């Protein structure tokens, strides 16, 4: 599972 923090880090 991908957490919100993980996603935002990839988006920058």
Curated annotation (Swiss-Prot):
This is Non-specific lipid-transfer protein. The lineage of its organism: Eukaryota, Viridiplantae, Streptophyta, Embryophyta, Tracheophyta. Plant non-specific lipid-transfer proteins transfer phospholipids as well as galactolipids across membranes. May play a role in wax or cutin deposition in the cell walls of expanding epidermal cells and certain secretory tissues. It comes from the Eukaryota. Keywords: Allergen, Lipid-binding, Transport. Belongs to the plant LTP family. One of its GO terms (molecular function) is lipid binding.
């Amino acid at each position: 599972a991908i957490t919100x923090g993980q996603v935002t880090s990839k988006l920058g």
